[in-house]
Every structure is written in C-alpha cells, then in structure tokens.
Regions:
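Carbohydrate-active catalytic/glycan-binding domains of CAZyme proteins
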Residues: 1-281
C-alpha cells in the first residue's frame, strides 16, 4: 500500500490533502472506514482505490481495472491512444455487503465492478441495456448508482456534446442493467435522449457533469456541476425533493419519463477561498 495523505504527524494537515493528480474523487464511509476512487485516464490499473480512517491520511489499496488494454488495445503503452477520453469520474458505493464501482470509459462504454474487499480483486462487467445488449458506446460519462430503501436501483449520468444533459436511469436491483435504455439510441450524439431508450432527462443545462445522487433524512439529492455559462450559470447545482423524480406545484409526483420540479440551489466556488454549506434535513 502506498501512503498519499496530507497528515503532518502532529495533529495538523495540509491542503491539498493529496498533492498529486487524483482527480474526480468520490469517497464513501463504511463503518469506521473511508474508501475513495479517483480518475486514472489511460493509466493501468484503472480507477485508483484509496482507504483512510480520518479523511486526511490516505493509502492506495488497489485499482479496479487490472489492465485497461483488456478492454481495448488502444489503452496499451504500445499505442497510448486513449489519454483524454477514458477513465473519468467513477463512483463507489456499498450495498448488501458488496462494494460497487461504476465508471464510463468515455470511448468504450459503461462498466461496473464488484468486490467483497475493495483492496482485493474486482470483477468487472459491462453494463447492459433493457435488451441485455452491452452498453458499448462513446460519450457517456460520470455515472453514479443509487439503491433506494425499497430495493430499487437507479443511475445518473450525462453525455458531453451539443446537448450536454443529465439523465436518471432505472436499473435492475443487482445494478447490472439499465431498464430504460437502448444501446443503439444511446450511441447517437448531440440529441436529447428519449425515455425508455435513454433514461429520464433531469438536467437540460449546457454542461452537466459530476453527477451524484444521495438520500438523506427524507430527501433525495441529485448533484451536478456546470462549468460552462452557455445555459445556466456555471457552478454546483443541488436538486432536492422528497420524491426521486420531483414534485409538481399541485402535489403531483414525478415518475420515470415525467420528471417534475425540485428545490434547487447553486453554489459558485470560483471566487471564494473556503466555503461551508450545511445541508438542510
């Protein structure tokens, strides 16, 4: 294991906590332990996995993809043709005694991996569409899974391009299949995807990425960033509702294919050195 933390050994720490290229960090807490995954671009092992007891001192404990060139030879050191188009913004979650990592390889499709021990071997699978076809296509990125209290599973993701929108998908309870997608429809670029072929549109802003979904104290939170000012103003957007698909003003609940409205708040951290936000609820 490789130590990469920011602790100074005297009860203090320095920022950045990890002074290296560990971009798109996604941490979770399981009991008294923290685990985090970060982007690796074309480098193997793909998707770095780290462990901490205090969110300050981190150790690299493994990687999800042992060799990315098993996905495509273009990842290999011989060709090196995947640098700016591969392992971005994965998400790690713990569900029913197992660790899950979801990641879209920008040039190669949607994948998920499962492990009993996050420091051990990960079993990698290709995510499938509603027809059980592998979701091998370009463009989709920044996925995040979510298991609701009723056992139903969901995924948020977005597709960079002309219509850089965010989508909410229904998954099978085991997280292996998107129930409202068709890979041939998902292969198209620069369009607004249709429900039952490409999920439910949740954000029609200009540059939706960094998608995350959480449930806390009776509220669902869908979080993403906008880094372009062409649609909404750039910043971090937090959507909140007591119904996952939102609620209309007359009280009607949203549902798959018919998204309603959320409480929404935008945070712009570009011009502030520090920021603290207390989450309601």
């Amino acid at each position: 294991m490789q130590y990469v933390g920011g602790g100074q050994g005297d009860g203090t720490y320095c920022n950045p906590i990890i002074a290296a290229d560990f971009s798109d960090p996604d941490p979770i807490r399981v009991s008294n332990d923290y685990y985090m995954v970060t982007s690796t671009f074309e480098t193997s092992p793909g998707v770095t996995v780290l462990h901490s007891k205090d969110l300050v001192n981190w150790k690299i404990i493994g990687g999800v993809f042992e060799e990315l060139d098993r996905i495509d030879p273009a990842f290999s050191a011989k060709y090196m043709k995947r640098y700016n188009g591969v392992v971005y913004a994965s998400a790690i979650r713990y569900h029913n005694g197992l660790f899950y990592v979801y990641v879209s390889l920008y040039t190669d499709g949607m994948f998920y991996a499962i492990a009993k021990d996050p420091a051990g071997k990960w079993t990698v699978h290709t995510l499938k569409d509603k027809h059980s076809n592998p979701l091998r296509m370009e463009g989709w990125t920044d996925p995040c899974p979510f298991w609701d209290k009723d056992g139903k599973a969901y995924l948020v993701s977005s597709n960079p391009g002309k219509n850089w929108f965010g989508y909410l998908f229904e998954m099978t309870p085991d997280g292996s299949q998107l129930l409202d997608t068709d890979v041939e429809h998902m292969k198209q670029r620069g369009i607004a995807y249709e429900y039952l072929l490409g999920g439910t549109l949740y954000s029609s802003s200009s540059s939706t990425e960094g998608n995350k979904i959480y449930y806390r104290n009776g509220y669902y939170y869908i979080i993403h960033i906008e880094f372009l000012d062409g649609g909404n103003v750039a910043g971090t957007y937090v959507y909140r509702s007591k119904n996952l698909y939102g609620i209309k003003e007359n009280g009607m609940l949203g549902k798959p294919g018919d998204m309603r409205t959320y409480e929404m708040k935008r945070f712009d951290l570009r011009n502030t050195g520090t920021y603290r936000q207390e989450i309601p609820g």
